[in-house]
Amino acid sequence: MMYQQQPKNQKQCKNIALHGYCRNSDKCEFSHELTPQQQQQQQQQQQQQQQQQQQQQQQQQQQQQQQQQQNSNGNGSNNTATSNNPIISPNSNIASPLKKSPIDNLTTSFQNLSTNQQTNHHWADHFQSGIPEYIPKQQLQQLQQQQLLQQQQQQALLLQQQQQQNYDDDQHLYPYGDNSVDDYEQHQYEPQPQPNNGIDPNMNNQFQINNFVAAQMRNASPQSYQQQFQQPNPSPQSSSQQQQQQQQQQQQAVYQQQQQQQPSSQPLAQNPSLQNNNNKLLQLQLQQHLQQIQAAQQQAQINQSYTPYPSYSQSVIRNKPGRRNIGSFFMSESLKQDILNQKSLLYLTLDPNDPRIKNIPPMLNKYHSLYPLDHDASRENQGKMFGYITSVYKAISTLDGLPYAIRRVEGFRLSSEYALQAAETWRNIQHPNIVSLKEIFVSKEFGDNSSLFFTYEFFPGSETLESKYLSQSGNPLSESVLWSFICQITSALKTIHSAGLVCRVIHPSKILLTGKNRIRMNGVGIFDVVNFDTPRILAQYQHEDLLLFGRLILTLACRSAQSTTTTNLSKSIEYVSNQYSKELYNLIVYLLTKPVINLPNIDEVVLMISGRLLQENNYLHTYTDDLETELSKEYENGRLFRLVTKLGFINERPLYDMDPRWSETGDRYLIKLFRDYIFHQVYDDGTPVLDFYHVVETLNKLDCGVDEKILLMSRDEQSLLVVSYKDLKKCIDSAFSELVSQKSHI
């Protein structure tokens, strides 16, 4: 019985699996037969190649037919120029949305090396319009999609402008257009009114979205392409501009005639109901894209248009060339008014006929001139925070003469002196957002058994967040202001928790607003003394600070003290999600969440709002620069005030060294004439010259001692003296030195 000889190895050759063939098939010891799966793949590839060849042949036939039709209808002159034609021809290799690539369905191992693929740009290129300092991971993907859509819209508008510019440059060569232009490229210049809002169901969905959004932006833009043709410019135009307008209108008429004569090359939809459904779906998608873009732009404008620290500086108005407004030489009126109000409140005292003076002692420890600061608050509300009735007074210290705020805790009996030592740590806490604790003492000056007193810094004109935002209705707080409050409180809590302490007074009634959105936490250290005997777990108390922090933000965002109750909590959070950014919503939810393990801490909050902290730092630096500018103005005014004071000491002095005419002789006479030159000049009609700029300019030149010379005239107009500012400065210094030397000898 004969047996067929078997090959040495039945394994398939790797070259067959990888490349489909083997060069050494006659010498190779492995099998070269294809598996059933490979045979199916080979058949599929052959079928795909045949289909592609058929499609290419059909496309070539269609292109030849179109060229024949266009050549028969067009001019021969249009076929001669090819290199300078700005309009793309159908045979061009440039990709077009209506030109289908012949290798779309080809799948090979080298497909990733194709040059037709989109390049992967750097991730920072998608955020050229700016992003918030902190973006949650849930929002990152949505924001990237919005940025990509905006870039596509900008590219579409730029392409249209470039094509229109190229056409205008070569209009003398092609006055009637090029008959070989595709319908798509002609619609780029003049879109025709089409049904279903201009949406073509045969085009790509993403391409239709981009075209529709670009059209909406053109219609909304005041300098769009359509308005350049249709709307006349009200401003006066030159003759060249008018000629350009007429040429553009002629181009528009030519394109309309060509599009009316040329039949549309787009195939009609076979199923009208399917076409309508697709159009409705596309319209909904487009509306959603537009709404998202508009919402993002509005939110960005709101965040960037308002700063929590408005500037004091005023815009400089120049009345004449080289002249400034008088207000630019002095402090801002608003800043001046704020300082005056604070100064007036520092020295308030009770009227002797005021009935409250009977219940206030004239002296309290080392403080006098007590003035009640919470006389308008009810007695019930004064004790709801600490469990005891409290009252606040302004008092003057006998040691340094400075005002302080003293909070009295009524009805509290101190059980141990260690309770006072527990609050001594607060005296070492110095933070710009914390009202510093200065002293704690016990006194019976109010006539009761004993009361506990806490001495704090005094900030005149301050008010609580409760009285500012919760006692009266108004518009919602700007998100910039909320983030400023959040950053300030976070900074204060970071300092408190790092020192091993707990705040526990994060409440609208205990946070003071002391300036332009500058807040300070008041009443620190009271709970450490009042609840000294209560067992403490530091981590839990610090987490309670974060819970109170979240409730405070939610209360201010809703401007309602009832927003954090059990019945209104879910509605309040929903309101924040609709009114403010996702970042603020996530922070509030994080602070109000109480997990079983791994309690949140202030360090995690700092990481969450790190971007906002940088923004707050920028605001503060800008505000500091503004205050330094105002301070520099007052420094200049102080320098000039010293000069005017010296002139006042010297001029018109009735008697000096037993000489009644001392101020009228010698160098003092020049000083008198210079005083008249500054303040007593008159116009030709006899009216006085009231020029502040002249006074400031003259005094500055005098202080510098410049060599510029001026003409001084006596009052009887009989004497004229030419003198420089440098000489006048020497005269003033010499005369003032005489006065000083005589005083030292006495």
Swiss-Prot record:
It comes from Dictyostelium discoideum. This is PAN2-PAN3 deadenylation complex subunit pan3. SMART domains: S_TKc. It is found in: Cytoplasm. Its main location: cytoplasm. Regulatory subunit of the poly(A)-nuclease (PAN) deadenylation complex, one of two cytoplasmic mRNA deadenylases involved in mRNA turnover. PAN specifically shortens poly(A) tails of RNA and the activity is stimulated by poly(A)-binding protein (PABP). PAN deadenylation is followed by rapid degradation of the shortened mRNA tails by the CCR4-NOT complex. Deadenylated mRNAs are then degraded by two alternative mechanisms, namely exosome-mediated 3'-5' exonucleolytic degradation, or deadenylation-dependent mRNA decaping and subsequent 5'-3' exonucleolytic degradation by XRN1. Residues 64-97, 221-275 have a biased composition (Low complexity). One of its GO terms (biological process) is mRNA processing. A zinc finger (C3H1-type) spans 7-35. PROSITE patterns: PROTEIN_KINASE_DOM, ZF_C3H1. One of its GO terms (cellular component) is P-body. It holds the Pfam family Pan3_PK. ATP binds at R407, E457, F458, F459, P460, G461, S462, E463, T464, S509, K510. It comes from the Eukaryota. The lineage of its organism: Eukaryota, Amoebozoa, Evosea, Eumycetozoa, Dictyostelia. The gene is pan3. The N-terminal zinc finger binds to poly(A) RNA. The pseudokinase domain, the coiled-coil (CC), and C-terminal knob domain (CK) form a structural unit (PKC) that forms an extensive high-affinity interaction surface for pan2. Residues 650-746 are annotated as: Knob domain.
